[in-house]
Amino acid sequence: MLLPKRVKYRRVHRGNMRGKAKRGTTVHFGEFGIQAQEASWITSRQIESARIAMTRYMKRGGKVWIKIFPHKPYTKKPLEVRMGSGKGAPEGWVAVVKPGKVMFEIAGVSEEIAREALRLASHKLPVKCKFVKREENGGDTNESN
């Protein structure tokens, strides 16, 4: 599972997830990807579960990029504990995902295999996802000399 090597603070505020993703909204490394359609916290366990679902379907073929990382700790108080008396102990790690963020990318497999692998991965995630392809018309591809 993914988690940071070290952090400056053990506990952080929850924050809010208003707005859309500013970066990471296009397929950059691979050929195909899944894009979040809504905002959510995605735990390191959910990321790992989605990765396993994809790689098993692809039978170790192709390459997978995970473009989200769980930097944010979330806390939980023990069961049957009264309110107050401080914030709970760190329970796990989450990645904050906003709408438009490309979470996983795949290359080296056909489109139908990639579509099915990413569909299986999206079932493991708590957000609605959309299949996206790499756009070849961007950048300096002007061929007029």
Curated annotation (Swiss-Prot):
Any single Pfam family the record assigns to this protein: Ribosomal_L16
Signal peptide annotation: none
InterPro entries, alphabetized: Ribosomal_uL16, Ribosomal_uL16_bact-type, Ribosomal_uL16_CS, Ribosomal_uL16_dom, Ribosomal_uL16_sf
GO molecular function, one term: tRNA binding
Database matches in PROSITE patterns: RIBOSOMAL_L16_1, RIBOSOMAL_L16_2
GO cellular component, one term: cytosolic large ribosomal subunit
Keywords recorded for this protein, A-Z: Ribonucleoprotein, Ribosomal protein, RNA-binding, rRNA-binding, tRNA-binding
Key word Cell wall biogenesis/degradation present: no
Keyword Manganese among UniProt keywords: no
Biological processes, Gene Ontology terms: translation
Family in the record: Belongs to the universal ribosomal protein uL16 family.
Subunit organization: Part of the 50S ribosomal subunit.
Protein role: Binds 23S rRNA and is also seen to make contacts with the A and possibly P site tRNAs.
Protein name: Large ribosomal subunit protein uL16
Protein species of origin: Exiguobacterium sibiricum (strain DSM 17290 / CCUG 55495 / CIP 109462 / JCM 13490 / 255-15)
Gene designation per UniProt: rplP
